[in-house]
Amino acid sequence: AFTNRRADGYGGSLAKRLRFPAEVVRAVRAAVGGDFPILYRHTSVEDVPTGNGIDLGTTVELCRTITDAGVNAFDITAGMQCCFELMTPPTCMPKAWNAATSAAVKEALGDRARVMLTGRISDADTAERVVRDGLADFAIMGRALIADSHLVEKYAAGRKDEICPCVACGQGCVGNADKMIPITCALNPLSGREASMPSVPKAETPGRVVVVGAGPAGLMAAATAAERGHEVILLERSDRHGGQISLAAVPPHKEDLRLISDYLYGKAQRAGVTFRFSCEATPESVRNLSPDAVIVATGSLPVVPRFCASAAGAVTAQDILSGAEAGKNVLVLGGGL
């Protein structure tokens, strides 16, 4: 065992290590009676560096023992502090990645207890697949409902395109929780602000707004302005939406980031934004639209050291992600993502 180092009746063999949780469950059952559901959350895979953490075999045996003690359902999760990525799986991990474990537990328990699966169930299609394919009896969502608390309602109504996606970035949810500040969502600015801003307020005096740039910031700004009642025209130099988020989605295992721009583009379209692609914004072209307000959302530029700004063969990360050739001998400056 990785954490249980006891040498008494509660440590050592698996049977002894299961004694404490079994006693707790039996005590709870005695207190609440036979008709009260008891749910047990279990870390099914620890994957600790020493190799002696909980594994599938231990999980199945534990669930059998705890079921006998009086549990009605198991919430199958994974990880611990030393393997945090299993607790809150990031974008690079497959959706419902731990479904094989929940399926094994479900097969071992039969009808004696229900099995729930947690871990990167980021959308309703994945949740439905987990239940339909018999991988678990219930699919549990956490971060997906932070991204869009109306996910289930929209999915049931056939409005899947309106669901704000969760890409498991962990920026506003896990990141803020670690800092002990209120959680938010990097994609949904209303998340975490429901009490102070339950909906987007209408503008007192609607006007014409010109937005420059169809990246995530520009798309969200355009959609919000249109939802407030403004006439919105968005100018984009390229022939498509997405901006730099399209480049961020190029590396392996980052494909889900494309969901961000696709969702925001659809949101802006539904709000009534007029798009003008392959249209570079200039002071004159913007003035000709007679806007009441202009929002410039043209994104950031890479920081290029002066000593290599004009060097032959020098390219930026954006250039590489756009398809530029780096050559055979490459020097990389900077260790960020």
For each predicted feature, which ranges?
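Flavin-dependent oxidoreductase catalytic cores
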Residues: A1-V212, P216, M220-E227, E231-V232, ...
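Short hydrophobic/charged patches on amphipathic alpha-helices used for structural packing
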Residues: C63, A124-E128, Y265, P283-R287, ...
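Short acidic/histidine-rich motifs immediately flanking catalytic phosphotransfer sites
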Residues: V71, S290-D292
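Short, contiguous acidic/charged loop-to-helix segments that flank catalytic cores in large enzymes
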Residues: T88-P94, P198-P206, L247-L259, T316-G323, ...
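A short helix-to-beta-strand connector/capping loop
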Residues: D111-A113, L135, A268-F275, S310-G313
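Rossmann-like dinucleotide/flavin-binding elements
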Residues: A203-L235, R276-S290, A297-F307, G313, ...
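Beta1-alpha1 glycine-rich phosphate/pyrophosphate-binding loop at the start
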Residues: V211-F277
